[in-house]
Amino acid sequence: MSTASPPSSPDPLNRASIPPGWGDTIVLLGRILIGGIFVQSGFDKLMGLDAFAAGLAARGLPAALVPVLAPIGASGEFFGGLAIVFGLMTRCAALLMITFVIVATLISHRFWVFQAAERRAQTVHFAKNVAIIGGFLFLFVTGGGRYCLDRWWCSNK
């Protein structure tokens, strides 16, 4: 009869290497950094909705869809970014932002239609957006951490 205890499952976040209390602070900082850029960019689009719509039309979106997609895209970017920053419905917000970034990337950074230097620049933007999607995937898995409205919301029901 073996007295050895079963191996414990590995901690996928390797929390043992993070000082106590820092993990949630780092998640908060990450949320502010990744969400903040979308808040700022979405706000700019909302304040200049006509220019944003013109840019979408110039990228080849059907003219009938532009008046619908421009406010939806700008609002989704702004409010999705706010939800990430404040940790409100973090996992849902992360999925919303993944969808937003995929659509925005396929509309604005189609590197395969460009030549030479512009192709290289658009490839960098495309790859950057793929990395941002990776950040949102992490938020989807980890949630908002201790310092988020999700935690307050769930504890007050």
Where are each of the predicted segments found?
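Perimembrane loop-to-helix junctions flanking transmembrane segments
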Residues: 53-64
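Extended, low-polarity transmembrane helix blocks
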Residues: 1-50, 64-75, 79, 86-157
